[in-house]
């Protein structure tokens, strides 16, 4: 269920991660919303999304479904690291499978056993660009097979210390932006969220942190 919408684009919805009721809205300076606090039900229920069974969906159909379901805000746009504009066509899409920052999430562990779901998410994501979808893995470790065996994407091995896992650094080295160009970025666990939407027809944002 949507909690609020983007005032600049009413098609972009921000949905509640749980079923329940809003108990507080925390505002900061100039009434900026800082937190929307939702008290979860004892048993989480999911709204069934209207997702066609046909897997051969067009780019426009995929974007429409993502907007209506509330998963669109997981797609970020560079430059400026804002929510992607669904009316733009990115020159490429970037997914950094690792974080080089200390004490950060291990995506090899977080996505363990989700190979099919991850690939399903990629199958939809690659349709959002006419260019390449770059899946970047660390060359400093042995990346999980979930990333190495991914299909339909360009796999790039990245070496070096922090901030080598930063997607902005990766873009600058692999496919630098020219004037008026944009690229879209997405986190590996959010690829799973998109896959669940099309696979299970529900907005399930559960994840390992």
Model segments located where?
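Short coil-to-beta-strand transition motifs
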Residues: 11-19
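Generic structural signal for buried aliphatic residues
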Residues: 1-3, 209
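Buried, small/hydrophobic-residue-enriched core segments of structured protein domains
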Residues: 9-12, 26-209
């Amino acid at each position: 269920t949507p909690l609020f919408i983007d005032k600049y684009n009413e098609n972009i919805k921000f949905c509640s991660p749980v079923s329940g009721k809003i108990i507080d809205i925390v505002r900061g300076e100039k009434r900026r919303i800082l937190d929307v606090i939702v008290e979860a039900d004892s048993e989480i229920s999911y709204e069934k999304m209207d997702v066609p069974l046909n897997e051969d969906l067009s780019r426009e159909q995929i974007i429409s479904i993502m907007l209506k379901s509330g998963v669109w805000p997981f797609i970020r746009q560079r430059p400026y690291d804002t929510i992607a504009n669904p009316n733009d066509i990115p020159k490429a899409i970037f997914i950094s499978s690792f974080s080089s920052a200390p004490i950060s999430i291990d995506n090899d562990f977080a996505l363990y056993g989700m190979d099919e779901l991850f690939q399903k998410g990629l199958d939809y994501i690659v349709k959002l660009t006419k260019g390449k979808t770059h899946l970047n893995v660390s060359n400093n470790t042995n990346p999980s097979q979930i990333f190495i065996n991914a299909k339909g994407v360009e796999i790039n091995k990245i070496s070096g210390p922090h901030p080598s896992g930063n997607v902005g650094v990766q873009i600058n080295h692999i496919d630098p932006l020219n004037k008026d160009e944009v690229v879209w970025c997405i986190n590996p666990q959010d690829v799973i969220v998109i896959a669940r939407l099309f696979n299970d027809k529900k907005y399930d944002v559960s994840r390992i942190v």
